[in-house]
């Protein structure tokens, strides 16, 4: 039986404006709220009722989880939040329009920053203090960096709940979920460039006690 549900947050205000978002804490758009509600409905129709919830520390992830769980009467779920599930930090690209970055730097560099595995964008020069984080946030991250900070959390915190027989819901971001799916499906560093996780559609797996996926992920319905 499928025991892991991955859900990318719904469309955000900056997704709507085609801006690089990263760790900037923006809210869901009206479309994103509808996507989150639909995600909850899909969980109900598929009879996928999670026992525990994991989210990032970013509002769009938390909003999506709350709206989806309202649809299945599970807002009371035990909940764990971690910066390790945050979106990839896009460095100095954060807040910039993707089309303008593409025009300025060209398709090859743009795709390397956006979809490549081990190429971080240009870093920020400094980072404002944020009470959510005990240590200073990164100034930029590649997808490899995201995977390196996510996998210890997966193995040490999330996986034990699956081994204990729980159904786990992880509501996170395009790149943190790409990093996890890369691990679960053993996707190569090259092929992961083609992997995209759509907003607001539950992606389900069956995870065995060793932490391996027994089948490729499938989207509901």
Curated annotation (Swiss-Prot):
The active site is at 9 (tele-phosphohistidine intermediate), 87 (proton donor/acceptor). One of its GO terms (biological process) is gluconeogenesis. This is 2,3-bisphosphoglycerate-dependent phosphoglycerate mutase. Keywords: Gluconeogenesis, Glycolysis, Isomerase. Substrate binds at residues 8-15, 21-22, 60, 87-90, 98, 114-115, 174-175. Residues 114-140 are annotated as: Disordered. InterPro entries: His_Pase_superF_clade-1, His_PPase_superfam, Phosphogly_mut1. It catalyses: (2R)-2-phosphoglycerate = (2R)-3-phosphoglycerate. Coiled coil: none annotated. CDD domains: HP_PGM_like. Catalyzes the interconversion of 2-phosphoglycerate and 3-phosphoglycerate. One of its GO terms (molecular function) is phosphoglycerate mutase activity. Its EC number is 5.4.2.11. The record marks 173 as: Transition state stabilizer. Pathway: Carbohydrate degradation; glycolysis; pyruvate from D-glyceraldehyde 3-phosphate: step 3/5. Belongs to the phosphoglycerate mutase family. BPG-dependent PGAM subfamily.
């Amino acid at each position: 039986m499928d025991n892991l549900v991955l859900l990318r947050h719904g469309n955000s205000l900056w997704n709507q404006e085609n801006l690089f978002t990263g760790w900037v804490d923006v809210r869901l758009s009206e479309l994103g709220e509808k996507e989150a509600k639909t995600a909850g409905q899909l969980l109900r129709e598929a009879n996928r009722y999670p026992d525990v919830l994991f989210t990032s520390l970013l509002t769009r992830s938390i909003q999506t989880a709350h709206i989806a769980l309202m649809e299945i009467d599970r807002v009371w779920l035990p909940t764990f939040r971690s910066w390790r599930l945050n979106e990839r930090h896009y460095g100095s690209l954060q807040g910039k329009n993707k089309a303008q970055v593409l025009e300025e730097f060209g398709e090859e560099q743009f795709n390397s920053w956006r979809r490549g595995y081990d190429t971080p964008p240009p870093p920020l020069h400094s980072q404002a203090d944020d009470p959510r984080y005990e240590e200073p946030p990164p100034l930029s991250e590649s997808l490899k960096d995201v995977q390196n900070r996510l996998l210890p959390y997966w193995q040490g915190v999330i996986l034990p709940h699956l081994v204990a027989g729980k159904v786990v819901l992880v509501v996170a971001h395009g790149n943190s979920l790409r990093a996890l799916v890369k691990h679960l499906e053993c996707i190569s560093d090259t092929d992961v460039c083609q992997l995209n996780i759509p907003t607001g559609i539950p992606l389900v797996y069956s995870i065995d006690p060793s932490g391996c996926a027994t089948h490729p992920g499938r989207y509901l319905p």
